[in-house]
Amino acid sequence: MLKRIPVTQLRLGMFVQSLCGSWLDHPFWKRGGFLLDSQADLQRLRESAVKEVWIDASKGLDLPEEAAVSAAAVLPVTMPAGPSPARVALEEEIRHAALLCSRAKAAVVSMFRDARMGQAIDTAHASDLVDEISASVLRHPNALLSLVRLKTSDEYTYMHSVAVCALMIALARQLELPDPLVREAGLAGLLHDIGKMAVPDPILNKPGKLTDPEFGLVRRHPQNGARMLLDCRQVSALVVDVCLHHHERIDGTGYPFGLAQEQISLLARMGAVCDVYDAITSDRPYKKGWNAAEAIRRMAEWNGHFDPQVFRAFVKAVGIYPVGALVRLESGRLGVVLEQHGRSLLTPRVKVFFSARSKVPIPQQVVDLGRAGQTDRIVGFEPAEAWNFRNLDEMWTGLAKSTGSYFDAGTGNP
């Protein structure tokens, strides 16, 4: 269990997950989470500018009960909880999410342009954007999480940041992290690739294989991004940590430092999953993306890449049959997944429209596979290209892509 406590209540044997405040304020900037087992480290923390830390009570000592009550009473609230937005129908939130994605794309283009020109990152604007994305995920998580997968290869650099932000928020809520940490996770997702602005566009968008020097330049984006975020002095250690460590792997084979297991913070482990999932489900200049179902299957096979507990929570957040996936039912009908069921990952709502046996269209019908008495079930995924289905995305989004993009906000590249 994660708890935020004053440094005055730290004691030896506690596991410090992260430190609150700027990385410039504390002497542990190269570390992820660590067990506080040194009196010297404890003294350095108490003498630093850090006022509060996150501890993980499942990995070390917890607060005494009376101290926990005291901490809850005195700690400031980073983000007011307030009433949760009312959950709305998928169709309604899709329309809202499409507009939000357009605004988010424009905001990220502007933010990345500023970073490329050496200007300060507008973290206040970024935080407001995170709040909007978080509210959309709360109203209906399937809407925004599914819609951001429809970005074009030209939009990837910017919409990838929006997608990872939304995925981090959904995953943080699935892990039942406290609201302040959910917000930090979202901001970390939005800014995790800011260091790519130090990489020239011809390399970022190169359709062929990168040369060794080009690949080396791309691999430096975590350090470049961390420096940018440190320079702006307005983001927490958690956000910088994700930027610096989202390419680390749980088995120690990642980069830039080859960290492993508990050396990698929880949010960085989350960032690794969300970053890879969106990357492999997106069309890139050099590779067409996998469908969401194939991506989940492949990621499950990559032993040593991801924290297993975090990955299981991620699958629960996005679903085994993600919205927009083409599936075959036992009845021989083909349909597109419309919505996940909270009760079971195996019984989504599906819009059927085609007979695989007769190979002809059938009247469209929404089938709730989780309804009592429903005997039909999903038997597998189908590749849409194999059936030459066009406008499949319009079937579940209800949106028409008339300009080549669902998120055309009239913006150009920085």
Curated annotation (Swiss-Prot):
Temperature-related behavior of activity: Optimum temperature is 30 degrees Celsius.
Pfam families reported in the protein's UniProt record: DUF3391, HD_5
Classification via SUPFAM superfamilies: HD-domain/PDEase-like (SSF109604)
Biological process terms in GO annotation: positive regulation of cell motility; regulation of single-species biofilm formation on inanimate substrate
Coiled coil: none
Organism whose genome encodes this protein: Pseudomonas aeruginosa (strain ATCC 15692 / DSM 22644 / CIP 104116 / JCM 14847 / LMG 12228 / 1C / PRS 101 / PAO1)
Catalytic activity: 3',3'-c-di-GMP + 2 H2O = 2 GMP + 2 H(+)
E.C. no: 3.1.4.-
Any one GO molecular-function label of the UniProt entry: cyclic-guanylate-specific phosphodiesterase activity
Enzyme class: hydrolase
Classification of source organism: Bacteria, Pseudomonadati, Pseudomonadota, Gammaproteobacteria, Pseudomonadales
Record protein name field: Cyclic di-GMP phosphodiesterase PA4108
